[in-house]
C-alpha cells in the first residue's frame, strides 16, 4: 500500500510537470516555425491543462480499463465544477460578464449532453469515439475562428497568449518536447498502476478509482489556475479555464479512451455519474445567468457547490 501510494503521488507530480514541459516545447517549436502566437495559444496551450487527463485515459484504456478512463473524464468534470469553482467562489465571488462565457457556455451544455447521450446505452463504440474526437477538432477550429474575429483585448486571446513561453532555441524546445512526452507516458503508467493497486486493496471498482483519486489528482492544475486567477482579478481566467477543460475532457479524454478500448461501461457511469455531471453543469449555468442577466457566482453558491462535492464523494464510497 505504501509503495502504491508513493506511485500515485509521484505519478501525479510528474504528470503535471511533464504536461507543462511538453506544452512548453511544442509551443516553442511552433513559434520558431512562425506559426501565429494566437493559433498556438488557442490550440497547444489550451490543451495543456487537459493533457494529464488525456494521457491517463489513454493509458487506462490501453490496459483494458475503459471504466477508469470514463471515470477520469466524468470525475474531472464533476470535480472542476463542484470543487474547483466552489472553492474559487468561496475565496472570492466570480464575475460572469464576458463574451468568452457567452460563447463557451452553450458549447459546454451541448457537449455535456452529447456525452450523456453516448453513455446512456452503457457502452461506447469506436464510431462514438471518432465523433468525440471530430468534435474536438471542430472545437479547436472554432476557437481559432473566434480568436481571429475577436478584439485585441478579448479574454479568450489574452488568457492563452499570456501563457506562451519566451523565445527558446529549437534544440532546447525539442528536448523539452521529447522529455515531456516520455515523462507523460511514464508518469501516467505510474499513476494508473498505483491507483489500481490501491483500488484492489480496498475492493474499489475501476470506475470508482477514476472518479476519485485520478479525477481529483488531475484536476489540481485547474484548481491552482482558478485560485490564482481569481486572486489576480482575472475572473474570466478562473471560470473560462474550467469551461474549456470540461469541453476538452468529454471530447478528447472520452474520445481517446473510446477509440483505444471501446466496450461496455459500468452502469453507474451511464446513470448516477452522468446525471451528476449534467446536474453540476446546469447548476453552474443557473448560477452564472439569472433571467438572461449576467451576474456573479457568490460565496453562498460556492459553499453549495462544495457541499455537493462532499455529498457526491460520500455517495460514491457508501454505494
Swiss-Prot record:
It is found in: Cell membrane. One of its GO terms (molecular function) is calcium channel activity. InterPro entries: K/Na/Ca-exchanger (IPR004481), NaCa_Exmemb (IPR004837), NCX_ion-bd_dom_sf (IPR044880). GO terms for biological process: intracellular calcium ion homeostasis. Disulfide bonds: none annotated. Its main location: membrane. It comes from the Bacteria. The keyword Ribosomal protein does not apply. The keyword Transport applies. It holds the Pfam family Na_Ca_ex. Coiled coil: none annotated. Keywords: Antiport, Cell membrane, Membrane, Transmembrane, Transmembrane helix, Transport. Gene3D superfamilies: NCX, central ion-binding region. The chain crosses the membrane at residues 3-23, 38-58, 81-101, 105-125, 127-147, 175-195, 208-228, 250-270, 275-292, 297-317. Belongs to the Ca(2+):cation antiporter (CaCA) (TC 2.A.19) family. Confers modest Ca(2+) and Na(+) resistance. This is Putative antiporter CaxA. It comes from Alkalimonas amylolytica.
Amino acid at each position: 500500500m505504501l509503495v502504491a501510494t508513493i506511485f500515485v503521488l509521484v505519478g501525479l507530480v510528474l504528470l503535471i510537470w511533464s504536461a507543462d514541459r511538453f506544452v512548453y516545447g511544442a509551443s516553442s517549436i511552433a513559434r520558431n516555425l512562425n506559426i501565429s502566437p494566437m493559433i498556438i495559444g488557442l490550440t497547444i496551450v489550451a490543451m495543456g491543462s487537459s493533457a494529464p487527463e488525456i494521457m491517463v485515459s489513454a493509458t487506462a484504456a490501453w490496459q483494458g480499463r475503459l471504466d477508469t478512463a470514463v471515470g477520469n473524464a466524468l470525475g474531472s468534470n464533476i470535480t472542476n465544477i463542484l470543487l474547483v469553482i466552489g472553492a474559487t467562489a468561496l475565496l472570492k465571488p466570480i464575475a460572469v460578464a464576458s463574451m468568452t462565457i457567452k460563447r463557451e457556455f452553450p458549447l459546454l451544455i451541448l457537449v455535456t449532453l452529447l456525452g450523456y447521450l453516448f453513455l446512456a446505452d452503457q457502452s461506447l463504440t469506436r464510431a462514438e469515439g471518432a465523433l468525440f474526437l471530430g468534435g474536438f477538432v471542430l472545437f479547436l477550429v472554432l476557437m481559432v475562428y473566434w480568436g481571429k474575429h475577436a478584439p485585441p483585448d478579448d479574454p479568450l486571446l489574452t488568457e492563452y497568449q499570456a501563457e506562451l513561453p519566451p523565445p527558446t532555441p529549437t534544440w532546447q524546445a525539442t528536448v523539452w518536447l521529447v522529455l515531456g512526452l516520455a515523462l507523460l507516458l511514464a508518469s501516467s503508467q505510474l499513476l494508473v498502476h498505483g491507483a489500481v493497486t490501491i483500488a484492489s486493496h480496498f475492493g474499489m471498482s475501476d470506475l470508482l478509482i477514476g472518479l476519485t483519486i485520478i479525477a481529483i489528482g488531475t484536476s489540481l492544475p485547474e484548481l491552482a489556475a482558478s485560485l490564482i486567477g481569481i486572486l489576480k482579478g482575472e475572473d474570466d481566467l478562473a471560470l473560462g479555464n474550467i469551461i474549456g477543460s470540461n469541453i476538452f475532457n468529454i471530447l478528447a479524454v472520452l474520445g481517446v479512451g473510446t477509440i483505444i478500448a471501446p466496450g461496455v461501461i459500468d452502469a453507474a457511469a451511464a446513470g448516477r455519474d452522468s446525471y451528476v455531471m449534467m446536474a453540476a453543469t446546469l447548476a453552474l449555468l443557473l448560477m452564472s445567468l439569472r433571467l438572461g442577466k449576467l451576474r456573479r457566482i457568490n460565496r453562498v453558491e460556492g459553499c453549495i457547490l462544495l457541499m455537493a462535492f462532499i455529498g457526491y464523494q460520500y455517495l460514491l464510497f457508501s454505494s
